[in-house]
């Protein structure tokens, strides 16, 4: 059956061809439901990371999450404050995330490094496994810097997915939900931290094993 309307011929019961926006949204949702869960699965992998069942990874996992989320908080505070100053702040990638700024990145990095150093000196267990420090002070500073920078990349990646999907927040991405807005900074941090943790533990394996005997 054919229906003629305003000179346009369509087939009854046949849906319109998918638009570019719909295709982009579908691809973004697929990317979110595949790549992001794969990245975040490294969080439980760190928790269950062990050479023997006696290894307690909870403090070091909390350390990773803490310095990353503190970077988020510092970036938000610094970015919000500088945005209200005369002349505003300097945007990072306005097309992807209009509110992200260089001032926010600097503020987040300072907050992350300071938090990492506080953990190192005041809570040694957070950089240790069974009493053996796996991160030195220089490594802790580097981790603080990278947690801020790489965490920002995860945030930007999530923002790009949301824009491609035409969603204001990640709650509109099927299978992910608004929780992604909380975990976005860990998308790239968790797998990289896991990889570095493998390297650090390998260097300290002999000492760690002594404490497990």
Say what each PLM segment does.
Residues 197-213:
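Juxtamembrane boundary at the C-terminal end of a transmembrane helix
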Residues 2-188, 211-213:
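Interhelical loop and helix-boundary elements at the membrane-water interface
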């Amino acid at each position: 059956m054919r229906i003629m309307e305003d000179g346009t011929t369509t087939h009854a019961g046949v849906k319109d061809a998918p638009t570019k926006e719909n295709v982009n949204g579908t691809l973004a949702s697929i990317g979110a439901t595949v790549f992001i869960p794969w990245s975040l699965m490294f969080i439980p992998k760190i928790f269950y990371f062990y050479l023997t069942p006696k290894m307690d990874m909870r403090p070091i996992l909390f350390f990773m999450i803490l310095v990353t989320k503190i970077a988020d908080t510092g970036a938000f505070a610094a970015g919000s404050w500088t945005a209200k100053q005369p002349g505003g702040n300097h945007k990072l990638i306005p097309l992807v995330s209009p509110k992200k700024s260089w001032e926010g990145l600097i503020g987040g990095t300072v907050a992350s490094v300071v938090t990492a150093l506080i953990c190192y000196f005041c809570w040694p267990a957070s950089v240790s496994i069974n009493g053996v420090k796996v991160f030195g002070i220089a490594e802790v500073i580097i981790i603080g810097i990278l947690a801020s920078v790489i965490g920002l990349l995860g945030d930007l990646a999530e923002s790009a997915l949301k824009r491609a999907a035409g969603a204001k927040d990640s709650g509109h991405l099927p299978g992910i939900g608004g929780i992604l807005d909380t975990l976005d900074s860990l998308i790239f941090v968790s797998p990289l931290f896991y990889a570095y943790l493998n390297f650090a533990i390998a260097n300290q394996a002999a000492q760690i094993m002594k404490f497990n005997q």
